[in-house]
Amino acid sequence: MIQTSETAQRYARALFELAQDKGDLATIHKDFRAFAALIKTSADLRKLLDSPAFSRDVKVSALAEIAKKAGYSPLFGKFLGTMATNGRANDILGAEFAFDQFYAKQRGVQRAIVRTAKEMTGAEKSRIESLLARVVGGDVELTSEVDPSLIGGIQLRLGSKLVDASVAKKLERMNTVMKGA
């Protein structure tokens, strides 16, 4: 899970409020998600954002070019430029995470993360999502992650609650019990 700095949260909150005032939340959310996906898949972009070897001016112009070519909204392009100008380019992913949380809360959607040892099918994801929606009494957006170290079973996080029904956790509990015996 991404950790967000207080600064990243402040930038995200400012963008969220501005986008909300302009009625542009969905567009900004879409742009932010697309840009975050780009960061996650491009080692060069991560290096640009994280490295102090690149000047702020280089970062600003590179981000402006990316925003232009990707067709991001002008507001989102300005946001990226502002973060780079203020030396916060390395906080963009944290700001995206915070923005995403604000957006979900505004829409009344709860987020859940499910981790399994192997990729889940669409039907499995849908079933878990519908079960969670019934439990929480509202909409749930499910994100799935693959973690082979779980061996089998499932880990489910909804808000601050974690249900760990993985084989790895069961083996860990058995090991603890056996050591105590």
From Swiss-Prot:
GO MF: proton-transporting ATP synthase activity, rotational mechanism
Keywords: ATP synthesis, Cell inner membrane, Cell membrane, CF(1), Hydrogen ion transport, Ion transport, Membrane, Transport
Oligomer status and interactors: F-type ATPases have 2 components, F(1) - the catalytic core - and F(0) - the membrane proton channel. F(1) has five subunits: alpha(3), beta(3), gamma(1), delta(1), epsilon(1). F(0) has three main subunits: a(1), b(2) and c(10-14). The alpha and beta chains form an alternating ring which encloses part of the gamma chain. F(1) is attached to F(0) by a central stalk formed by the gamma and epsilon chains, while a peripheral stalk is formed by the delta and b chains.
Protein's name according to its UniProt entry: ATP synthase subunit delta
Job description of the protein: F(1)F(0) ATP synthase produces ATP from ADP in the presence of a proton or sodium gradient. F-type ATPases consist of two structural domains, F(1) containing the extramembraneous catalytic core and F(0) containing the membrane proton channel, linked together by a central stalk and a peripheral stalk. During catalysis, ATP synthesis in the catalytic domain of F(1) is coupled via a rotary mechanism of the central stalk subunits to proton translocation. This protein is part of the stalk that links CF(0) to CF(1). It either transmits conformational changes from CF(0) to CF(1) or is implicated in proton conduction.
Lineage per the UniProt record: Bacteria, Pseudomonadati, Pseudomonadota, Alphaproteobacteria, Hyphomonadales
Classification via Pfam families: OSCP (PF00213)
Compartment(s) where it occurs, according to its Swiss-Prot or TrEMBL record: Cell inner membrane
Membrane topology: Peripheral membrane protein
Gene: atpH
Family: Belongs to the ATPase delta chain family.
Superkingdom of the source species: Bacteria
A cellular component term, taken from the record's GO annotations: plasma membrane
Entry-linked SUPFAM superfamilies: N-terminal domain of the delta subunit of the F1F0-ATP synthase
PROSITE patterns, per database record: ATPASE_DELTA
